[in-house]
Each structure stands twice: as C-alpha cells, then as structure tokens.
Amino acid sequence: LVAAGQRAEAVAKYEQLTKEHPNDERVQVAYAQLLLDGTDAKDWQAALSRWRQNEKKSRRASTMWFRAKYSQAVAHHKLGEPAQAAKIIRVTQTIYPELGGGQLQMQFLELLRRCEPRLRTDQM
C-alpha cells in the first residue's frame, strides 16, 4: 500500500493488525517502522511510543532490543531532539560498547555523529 501511494491506508491496516496480533513481533515492528518512516511529528511521536513498547517486549541486548533503542534515537532526532537521541545512544554504548555489533553499531555511531553537530549549533 505504501509503495502504491496509499500510506494512510497502510497505517490504518497495520494499526488494526497490531490490535489483532499484539504478540506478533513482525507486525509490531513493521507498524513501528512505518510510523518512523512517516513525514511528520505525529508519526514520529507514535513511532517513538511503539518502539518503546517493542523494547519492553524484547530480551535485553537482543538484536530487536538494539533495533528498538536505535529507532527511538532516530525518532528523537527526527523530532528535533538531538540531545535526547545522543543520550539514548551514549547510555546504550556505556552498557554495551559494541552497540549490537556490525551494521547496528555503524548505524548507531552514524546517528550519533549526525546529532553532535546539531548539539554544538543548538548550544551557541
């Protein structure tokens, strides 16, 4: 639906699916990602909430847990809150220096790099 330009319909359908399948990780993650890929603060705020829920449902330090942490940081970055995004990454990195390893680690570090110039500018 999204590819066909029917994003609103896709959001509505996934919202319904999340209610019908509250324990289906694939459905929950797909909906959270759809919201995170949105274009406005309303979507990003909803995505932040969904990724927090996904984090709570996942095993600590699992790939899903790291993905949820990263996605929360992305949501904060999109919402114009680079300090909060950086804080999530730094706290996670303090406890788990490898940040999930591989691609996830690279994504975390790239997002942190993008947050830092905004922090310096915002503090001037």
Feature annotation, model-predicted:
Residues 5, 39-42, 80:
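Residue-level detector of the short coil/turn that links helix A to helix B
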Residues 10, 44-47, 85:
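Single-residue signature of alpha-solenoid repeat helices
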Residues 30-34, 64, 71, 78, ...:
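"A position-specific structural signal for the A-helix of alpha-solenoid helical repeats
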Residues 1, 35-38, 76:
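Residue at a conserved register position within TPR or TPR-like alpha-solenoid repeats
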Residues 15, 49-52, 90:
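Alpha-solenoid helical repeat scaffolds
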Residues 21, 51, 55-59, 95-103:
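Alpha-helical junction/boundary sensor with strong preference for TPR arrays
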